[in-house]
Amino acid sequence: MASRANVPPARAQAVDQSVARLFEAFDRVPVAAVIRHAEDLPRALASQVPAIFFVRAPAFHLGPLVWAVQARGKMAFVHIDLIAGLGKDRAGVAFLAREIGVNGIITSHSGLVAAARADRVIAVQRLLLYDDLGLHSAMAAVEHARPDIVEVQPAVIFPLVADLIRARHPVPIIVGGFVTEPHQREAALQRGARAISTSTVSLWP
């Protein structure tokens, strides 16, 4: 499996720069807008959020959506696991990276994290945490895949596991899932999350 040690230096440098640029923007506005419905995109484009996460969009709609985001100076991420009509494999990753030109790919699968890294886009590994067993399995998956960013869901779990995750894997953390109120956003940020991801329009500044 790919790791930073055996990824070509040009890839590592380019993606490191993209990650640094993203988190410089998150330092100012620590919110990524999650788009489940196309009608929400204009509001996200008009907001100050530096990144937009696409989930559940049909594959044949993705190009114009991603390009509209990038035209506004924002970064576009696609959750490959949830995109209808797109292979959940290396070919699907290559299509998003090379044909669409996404800034990053979100996935729960370690193999797709490696594929995203190989294709020189930001790799975000989503961790769905429900119990202690799931936490330890997730930690092993992150250690194996070495993503650029970890997204922890649901947000209510993060304060309970934040110290363990940061101790084992010092990569930037985004928190999402059921972030619907300002106090939930602030709780995640206070526990060390660099940003939150949410589809709640009222939380997009």
Sequence positions of predicted segments:
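A mid-sequence interfacial segment
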Residues: 13-15, 20, 109-144, 149
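Catalytic beta/alpha-barrel core
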Residues: 32-36, 50-59, 77-85, 99-110, ...
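Alpha-helix-loop-beta-strand connector modules within alpha/beta enzyme cores
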Residues: 63-82, 90-91, 98-100, 114-126, ...
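Catalytic cores of alpha/beta
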Residues: 41-44, 91-96, 138-144, 161-169, ...
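Glycine-rich phosphate-binding active-site loops on the catalytic face of alpha/beta enzymes
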Residues: 52-58, 111-112, 154-157, 177-205
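Short loop/helix-cap segments at secondary-structure boundaries that form the rim of catalytic
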Residues: 43-47, 113-118, 165, 187-188, ...
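Conserved N-terminal beta1-alpha1 strand-loop-helix module at the mouth
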Residues: 2-80, 84-86, 101-102
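Short, charged, surface-exposed secondary-structure boundary motifs
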Residues: 61-68, 86-88, 132-141, 160, ...
